[in-house]
Amino acid sequence: MKLSRRSFMKANAVAAAAAAAGLSVPGVARAVVGQQEAIKWDKAPCRFCGTGCGVLVGTQQGRVVACQGDPDAPVNRGLNCIKGYFLPKIMYGKDRLTQPLLRMKNGKYDKEGEFTPITWDQAFDVMEEKFKTALKEKGPESIGMFGSGQWTIWEGYAASKLFKAGFRSNNIDPNARHCMASAVVGFMRTFGMDEPMGCYDDIEQADAFVLWGANMAEMHPILWSRITNRRLSNQNVTVAVLSTYQHRSFELADNGIIFTPQSDLVILNYIANYIIQNNAINQDFFSKHVNLRKGATDIGYGLRPTHPLEKAAKNPGSDASEPMSFEDYKAFVAEYTLEKTAEMTGVPKDQLEQLAQLYADPNKKVISYWTMGFNQHTRGVWANNLVYNLHLLTGKISQPGCGPFSLTGQPSACGTAREVGTFAHRLPADMVVTNEKHRDICEKKWNIPSDTIPAKIGLHAVAQDRALKDGKLNVYWTMCTNNMQAGPNINEERMPGWRDPRNFIIVSDPYPTVSALAADLILPTAMWVEKEGAYGNAERRTQFWRQQVQAPGEAKSDLWQLVQFSRRFKTEEVWPEELLAKKPELRGKTLYEVLYATPEVSKYPVSELAEDQLNDESRELGFYLQKGLFEEYAWFGRGHGHDLAPFDDYHKARGLRWPVVNGKETQWRYSEGNDPYVKAGEGYKFYGKPDGKAVIFALPFEPAAEAPDEEYDLWLSTGRVLEHWHTGSMTRRVPELHRAFPEAVLFIHPLDAKARDLRRGDKVKVVSRRGEVISIVETRGRNRPPQGLVYMPFFDAAQLVNKLTLDATDPLSKETDFKKCAVKLEKV
């Protein structure tokens, strides 16, 4: 039977609908299904955001040819967002990289040379020489790596081992520093453990949703569809949305609040005051499970020490705090009255009161959601702490339908960056490099000499840029990220270091991104289902997938690159004599033998793979590398509240939420009956803290690092749009997504445009103290800024909005504030 494309699509839809309804399938549809049998289907988590949707990947003749939502996936229940439906096309852009490229002139490496194809051996030869020279001349602090919340779990673990144990350098940081670091520090300060206590199942049981700086309609659309269903199917459910500009999530809001940038801190303290003044504290919960502390203030803005703002700060970078009484806390928040809050924020009083009443009502189960509006904030950690205060005052936490929930933006910002510990200060399972006991645990497990892992915190993302510019960091390897486009203050603090002849820059990527084109060596990288992988999503759900196709040309996975490069170094080339003397049996061994081909990692044979199962790395090495690395890594968390299931369980399940104890996942942490670590009779136990109590912090409003003035008279906020993901390096290569939103625009209030003689569609020069870009005026559409603020997405490589942004960071988390800087507009 031959069918036209139209008939095929129609019959396929009929077959799908009939199957869903449990009806008999028409003959023509059965014929279509028969034609489709040549397609092989397997499960995988989506490649994009931190929601962790499950998809079914269809492969045929060595290519990914189809993708659909996985109806058995509990996160998305068969639904995809627009990006998810086009997943296959991200892999087959016309400019996909397939061989290593080195800048060369006259047959040799030259910083100003043209990119020239070379072999992997030649690439590793150059890298080996650069690494060894830097290590010999300047030591481990002269090398660094910038990784990703898109790394698989074992890629992040392998990278962390290579740098922290092998090269003895903590100068490794993920791009999650730009998005989730404030959430991490907020969790650690309040609860002593990272990541949310609740899960997505809360959505169907909540009475109210409050979005703090989160446009879930575009950034987490599948979760938003579940919230929308909950809101529209129950008239008693309320949605409040807070933002510095109006966006698509406001369409569902019962209370849509637009506030002055940075003044969310004021609103949070006002609500705490309202709860106290209206006797809405859950006294039983509060008295048993909460401590009060006053945090250090005037902590600076994470700029260079020579910056006037840093010189003026009384307590730069301080996370110190001291105990305080309830009466002192009550007096502290009492300053944040309704009148003062309305004046400072620009929010009408009635809207503020409506918002506060949601938290104060003992019969309302409330979920607080936030993403970059809170985290990309010079007081992002404080914002996280302050929203926890509201839930701790009212006891609305760790129970179905209520709790604070930090949403993530990358597929494994939680599972890899945070849980594995690829930050410059972290080790697996919430351990840190500054703690001698934690270092000792890792060194013993890894069978390396004591004192191998440095106690000094390495360079975080922004500090890496500065060190490159200053000539202190000389060899720099970035993987699975496009920081030349995504990071702040490109002109002043990033590009100078990358193009400095003292420095050698390596970029591993599937495509010639802005970062790749600014590098010295480009390594072609396998992506998504071209390798076996694992991600951890925002609700602590760890999900696995199998390799389903092979990468094009000579492209190799990040894991392969890390492990194979480690063969180039022997212990005596990277470790001092005093370390080798502690374990002389490691002399003469390569880092590959010491870190990866160990008895513990290599004990899982390749025969555990199905005969026809692709796994390029393991089949080349002769052992099941991914399983060995995962089981070694999982050991750190088991028995300590971070329990992961056995490796094989994840290939069978649609993800499991840790802690997984006795085969059972955990939906709600810290509460009796839900969390296996909370004993009968304890009620609640925040066991990340020694006394089992969470902390409420007293923290004030402090202004932004840069605000509009007479010359630079507008706030600039940056972010994403539905159709594109981050810098667009994948989504802009999907024709349908590119057509839907082909270039960045400057969203602006019509009156602000009119005052500058600008009309919709005009070209406009956007200028800050650091740089300028040309964009296009948009006075309508999905984003409607108030007067005084403009919004611009960062997906467009032709409009590098981060030439404009300031590299101010939260001094505690070191996360950049991409939401607030000052600009002016000039008509072109």
From Swiss-Prot:
Please identify the protein, giving its name as recorded: Periplasmic nitrate reductase
Taxonomic lineage from the root: Bacteria, Pseudomonadati, Pseudomonadota, Gammaproteobacteria, Enterobacterales
Q: Output the PTM entry.
A: Predicted to be exported by the Tat system. The position of the signal peptide cleavage has not been experimentally proven.
Q: Where are the transmembrane segments?
A: none
Write down the SUPFAM superfamilies for this protein, in alphabetical order.
ADC-like (SSF50692), Formate dehydrogenase/DMSO reductase, domains 1-3 (SSF53706)
What's its catalytic activity? 2 Fe(II)-[cytochrome] + nitrate + 2 H(+) = 2 Fe(III)-[cytochrome] + nitrite + H2O
Note on how the cofactor is bound: Binds 1 [4Fe-4S] cluster. Binds 1 molybdenum-bis(molybdopterin guanine dinucleotide) (Mo-bis-MGD) cofactor per subunit.
Q: Which cofactor does it need?
A: [4Fe-4S] cluster; Mo-bis(molybdopterin guanine dinucleotide)
Q: Which residues bind [4Fe-4S] cluster?
A: C46, C49, C53, C81
Q: Name one Pfam family in it.
A: Molybdopterin
- First-level EC class: oxidoreductase
Q: Which residues bind substrate?
A: F794
Which HAMAP family does this entry report, sorted A to Z?
Nitrate_reduct_NapA
Enumerate the Gene Ontology biological process terms.
cellular respiration; Mo-molybdopterin cofactor biosynthetic process; nitrate assimilation
- The reply to whether Metal-binding figures as a keyword in the UniProt entry is yes
What keywords are assigned to this protein? 4Fe-4S, Electron transport, Iron, Iron-sulfur, Metal-binding, Molybdenum, Nitrate assimilation, Oxidoreductase, Periplasm, Signal, Transport
Q: Which family does it belong to?
A: Belongs to the prokaryotic molybdopterin-containing oxidoreductase family. NasA/NapA/NarB subfamily.
Annotated EC: 1.9.6.1
Say where the protein is mainly found. Answer: periplasm
Residues in the signal sequence: 1-31
What is the species listed in this Swiss-Prot or TrEMBL entry? Escherichia coli O139:H28 (strain E24377A / ETEC)
Claim: DNA damage is one of the keywords in the record:
no
List the subcellular locations.
Answer: Periplasm
Q: How does it assemble?
A: Component of the periplasmic nitrate reductase NapAB complex composed of NapA and NapB.
